[in-house]
Amino acid sequence: MNAQRIFSLSLSLITAAVLSACVSENDTSSKEPASSLTEPASIPARRAEGESKVLSDYGQYQGALDAAKRGDDMWVQQFLAQAGDSAMAETVRNEWLKSLGARGQWDVFRQENKKLNAAGRVQEVQCYAELSSGSYNMAAELVRVTNKLPAGCTRLVESAASAGRLNSNDAWRRVRGLLSNSQTSDARSLAAALGSPFEGGSQGAREYSLLNVIGKDARKSSSAASTLSSMESGLSREQSSFAWGVLGLYQAQNQNMQTALSYYNRVSDRKQLTDEQFEWYARAALRLQRWNELSGIIQQMPDNLQKDPTWQYWLGRSYAAQGNQSRAKDMYEKAAASGRNFYAVLAGEELGRRINTKNNVSDADKKDVRRMADDGAIKRALVLFKNSQSSNDAKMRRQAQAEWRFATRDFNEDNLLTAAQVAFENQFYDMAINSADRTERKLNYNLRYLSPFKETTVRYASQAGIDPAWVYGLIRQESRFVMGAQSSVGAQGLMQVMPATAREIAGKIGMSSSELYTMDGNIRMGTWYMADAKRRLQNNEVMATAGYNAGPGRARNWQASTPLEGAIYAETIPFTETRDYVKKVMTNATYYASLFNEPQTSLKQRMGTVPGRY
């Protein structure tokens, strides 16, 4: 049945709900406070609502959200009065606060902002809160962001600029960044707020002239570097440095690493580089395996990048390549301490450690699992999840996920593992992983790395001649085992196969393309496609993983002319999504291999060497 039709907003329903004994957003008596990770579990017991009430709230939610965005204050107030303490209410309140801030309704804004849990307050609402109080604490950090900000944060930065509360160098660097990202209107507004508009002979006008080399089309020109060289005498050190950083970034992302380094090396003020530019400066040196140069680049990165396990690991590798094993070990220790990510695992292996997938906690107590399942906030998420499954409603499923994250965000580690068990038993697999993944000391790898549908997956992996651990590593990243998962571009199911690809596969292996929408058919198609990608890409798992995400042609284009270490290939993939995807899939596969007692449990060996382009 159509939930929107059945549960449409009506004044009578709202009035009845207000008079009912539901929990209001101001009722904090039933909330479970955050607990120390060392405390024993105290299972929350928030008031439960009936299924019809949960679905009623969901039916009204989208209308209330639309009302919040258009500033229909009465409708929003009516919804919040009866919606209870939920992710739905929190989302609506955030949207309403954005609208109130945009309209300058500061008295109502301040009143409603107090009702919002700080953990759920979105960045734009925080910006409006500072505008409402005349504070500019966030502006100093926001001005260092060189791409588009939410409207409220843009207003905060411009207000701080007008009040003379920003570092001038940072502010003009943001103007350049906006210009390079085609955000000309925001760049113009900030320049005006700084008192130097783009018109006339002001600094703003000189910044605007940089579009001739840093604009999205201009930087692609073969003459961009010569144009910048001819302009340099009229540019400040900061302007010139930023512009060379833009050109270096473009060349590095197009795998022209020698040229990229030559441009980056003309940057005289490296404080002008954005994080993205700095990382690609390092990737250019990494791809060419210029270890001395790489270590120097990493050591000049801002603190936040130097603390990233990516660059801790590669700094360690660069020290090792230069023969400094003691300093290399120090960096590996730092990277290995960052968790269970790609570089933590690789760093651990450099220190002689292999991943350990032995649980250090017992399974959750069955009584605790039952009590957790009865918690009102958990139950709300489960109601939405089960109804989304039966109706194949992707939007409702996303809201169920939001409610689960809302319900568990203050949980200690014991409760997270109990919640993960509840989710697993209800086949809410993605949220089982979400909860289990958030523990740091109490570890249950069977919940972190779930393996549902195992008989089917292993059977089709074996038929395709590929490693089941690799298949599970890919499914965990693609869909988190959500049966009806559908991407924004139309990829379907557990293995996120595109319908057009499914038709092609079906014709080759004697299936109906409609089997894409079944568990069995989706896994069969996905494993066949993985094997085909591997065969087409020189039998290399790393390239096949990249090809599964971005297409085999791109994976082939990213090869070097000579063999390249798999981790270097992965780190220098130009697409952020694919770069992260490959690292996560291969890390997942290594953990699954350990859980499945396979012999291949080294991530470095699994990454191997990517052959040269032929």
Task: Give each language-model segment a name.
Residues 2-25, 585:
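Gram-negative bacterial Sec-dependent N-terminal signal peptides
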Residues 13, 21-463, 469, 489, ...:
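Alpha-helical solenoid repeat scaffolds
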Residues 227-234, 262-264, 269, 322, ...:
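Catalytic glycan-binding domains that act on GlcNAc-containing polysaccharides
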